[in-house]
């Protein structure tokens, strides 16, 4: 990774630390500035990374952009959870497309990831879906579809065979599952801070994946 990309990732890391602090302290004004800066820094890093595949880079940048929209939507005072989830869903679809674009996916790694995802999700997913069902049919359907797409993202990230993508996919799955748990079941250990930490680490991982 070149100097420019490294500096931008480092700056994104600093913004992330500020964001996590603001979330823990419930400083919404600081969070409103720091949270978008994390993803903006990572978008810049993705654009600066030396990679021979411009299409995959473009898809990752677009996914980061969709995630940025979701972050901003969920921070607004009159935030609509559905709109934020839709933006994140678009980000997942773009990441999935990027993985498929690379070709040569490792079936063995994908199967292993699928088994792990099913095992981990066995306890949490039914409770999240049950909680979403109480919010109405639209929310129930939206959350169910989102969880399925999230699982596919993690599965295909593992199937790339790249360690950075594997870890990033697992972290993104964890982040979104925690978000759903906090929203529809109960406050998860670490609350919103852990959601942010895992989410930001996942996006960093996908940017690093571009260099592999």
Name these PLM-found stretches.
Residues 1-212:
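Polytopic alpha-helical membrane-helix bundles and their juxtamembrane interface segments
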């Amino acid at each position: 990774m070149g100097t420019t990309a490294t500096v931008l990732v480092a700056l994104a890391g600093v913004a992330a630390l500020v964001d996590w602090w603001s979330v823990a302290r419930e400083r919404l004004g600081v969070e409103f500035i720091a949270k978008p800066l994390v993803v903006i820094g990572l978008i810049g890093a993705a654009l600066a990374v030396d990679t021979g595949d411009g299409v995959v880079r473009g898809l990752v940048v677009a996914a980061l952009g969709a995630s940025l929209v979701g972050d901003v939507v969920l921070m607004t005072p009159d935030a609509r959870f559905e709109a934020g989830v839709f933006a994140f869903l678009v980000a997942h679809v773009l990441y999935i497309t990027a993985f498929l674009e690379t070709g040569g996916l490792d079936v063995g790694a994908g199967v292993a990831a699928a088994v792990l995802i099913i095992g981990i999700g066995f306890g949490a997913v039914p409770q999240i879906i049950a909680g979403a069902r109480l919010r109405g049919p639209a929310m129930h359907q939206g959350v169910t579809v989102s969880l399925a797409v999230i699982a596919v993202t993690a599965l295909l990230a593992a199937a790339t065979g790249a360690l950075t993508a594997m870890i990033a996919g697992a972290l993104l799955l964890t982040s979104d599952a925690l978000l759903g748990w906090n929203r529809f079941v109960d406050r998860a250990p670490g609350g919103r801070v852990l959601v942010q930490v895992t989410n930001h680490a996942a996006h960093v991982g996908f940017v690093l994946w571009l260099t592999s």
